[in-house]
């Protein structure tokens, strides 16, 4: 809601209290350097969630690549053709494993999908959806049936994850995790209070949930639409939940209470937390404290849309509502931390003009 007494001054920055965790640690979201900050002043900058949006593998805060060439996947609808574009089509293709790029080879034709679809299906079924004869692509389409000038039934040909368990091994960082970690190292980890104590000592190692469980699809392949559990809870059911069911999705520094994959105790909000604070899917609300006037990321994967080969992550729009965006979009980044239950409030009343200040015991 429109909370006015959740301002905290910590480590030279302003934060907003999101909630009190079960162990009395306090979850905070970055809110700039002044209580008057708004828009892009409330984030540490912008970032893509990841540089690839064509594969659900990369919706992980971390992920793992166990990839293989797949050229006989389930037929699916593809709705991302442009009806007036002249695409090239061929009767064969090659794949470069080093660059992970497909290329058209052999005999080729070109034309709009509407004008050449019969000849394509019969003799030249492969396309990169490129207007260049030598264009390359990260996935290929085998055209199977004409649906409309901008859509077709296709087989995806991909170099992609072999199964769902593989992507949960969490060996590689997302783009946004790299940005958050770099910021934290400079501005919290390597920064000290007036007593020479690192500000990281004030923090508690709590779970950041990158919930990759799903309610439909398979969570890893390009040929199936996947709806992740966070989407089902918050969009279809409107029943947010703070439980993180899958150990691999519980991002923590220590493996005592999570996956032990974080370098630093910092992450992002989930859309469940946004919903509990007052955010609603596609319903404008610029009156609650998480609405800043700048769109910014959560760490909740929501949908992989096989009809467009787009992976979507949850975010808060400039107007304050919960929405989704492709993972390659550049949105604001607002780090989230947890103050230790051992800290003491040393001043302030949490209001805009008098934010809380905190200290460690005997410090």
Give the ranges of each region predicted by the language model.
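Long, domain-scale functional regions
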Residues: 1-363
